[in-house]
Amino acid sequence: MKLTCMMIVAVLFLTAWTFATADDSSNGLENLFLKAHHEMNPEASKLNERCLDAGEICDFFFPTCCGYCILLFCA
């Protein structure tokens, strides 16, 4: 029991030490959201794409149907 507790404490200590001494050249999470916001391209969002209705011609390799692409037609 004592050995188990000592092992748990040692693992927790080493984990904390690893995170505390890790080299972080990007200033941590400080600018993470600002950077992600500026790199985001809203025009490339999949939510802006219109899906094809049933009966319209679709591409087999890159289907954009609302349902399934079967034999080059949306189902």
Curated annotation (Swiss-Prot):
Propeptide ranges, please? 23-49
What is the first-listed, main subcellular location in coarse terms? secreted
Keywords attached to this Swiss-Prot or TrEMBL record, sorted alphabetically, are: Calcium channel impairing toxin, Disulfide bond, Ion channel impairing toxin, Knottin, Neurotoxin, Presynaptic neurotoxin, Secreted, Signal, Toxin, Voltage-gated calcium channel impairing toxin
At the top level of its lineage, which domain of life is listed? Eukaryota
- Could you say which residues form the signal peptide? 1-22
The residues forming a coiled coil are none
> What is the tissue localization of expression for this protein?
Expressed by the venom duct.
Give all cystine bridges in this chain.
Answer: C51-C66, C58-C69, C65-C74
Q: What InterPro entries does UniProt report for this protein, alphabetically? A: Conotoxin
One Gene Ontology CC term in the entry:
extracellular region
Q: Which GO terms describe its molecular function?
A: calcium channel regulator activity; ion channel inhibitor activity; toxin activity
Could you tell me where this protein is found in the cell?
Secreted
Please quote what the entry notes about the protein's domains. Answer: The presence of a 'disulfide through disulfide knot' structurally defines this protein as a knottin. The cysteine framework is VI/VII (C-C-CC-C-C).
Name the family. Answer: Belongs to the conotoxin O1 superfamily.
Q: What does this protein do?
A: Omega-conotoxins act at presynaptic membranes, they bind and block voltage-gated calcium channels (Cav).
Q: What is this protein called?
A: Omega-conotoxin-like TxMKLT1-0142
**Annotated source species:** Conus textile
Lineage start: Eukaryota, Metazoa, Spiralia, Lophotrochozoa, Mollusca
